[in-house]
């Protein structure tokens, strides 16, 4: 029993940190006068995949979560200007575990954002 709990805890922590990494990879908030700029749609990756949002309590609507932290998750909606992950969470988790693939895909997305 104890080994299962330890293993389950380890897997849960890894998944939590992977999702956090995926949602914020490569995105920066400017810091002027010692204060970070206000959070915008360009500071987290969103996902419009309905099945993923249903199964993760709207986890993919990450930008609005940061902009309206007290808003209940069923009321979160997709922001039109929000930047999109190139795939759903399942694919993104696998990609994050394969660094060469992750950097190949995501660094191009970030480079494209810098031209906007």
Description of each model-found segment:
Residues 5, 11-116:
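Cytosolic/stromal cytosol-facing helical appendages immediately following the last transmembrane segment
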Residues 1-3:
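Transmembrane helix interruption/hinge and helix-loop junction motifs
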């Amino acid at each position: 029993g104890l080994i299962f709990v330890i293993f389950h805890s380890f897997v849960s922590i890894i998944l939590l940190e992977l999702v956090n990494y995926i949602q914020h990879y490569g995105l920066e908030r400017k810091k002027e006068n010692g204060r970070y700029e206000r959070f915008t749609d360009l500071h987290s990756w969103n996902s419009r995949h309905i099945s993923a949002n249903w199964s993760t309590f709207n986890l993919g609507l990450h930008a609005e979560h940061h902009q309206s932290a007290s808003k209940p998750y069923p009321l979160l909606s997709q922001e039109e200007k929000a930047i999109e992950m190139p795939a759903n969470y399942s694919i993104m988790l696998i990609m994050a575990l394969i660094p060469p693939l992750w950097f190949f895909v995501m660094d191009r997305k970030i480079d494209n954002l810098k031209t906007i």
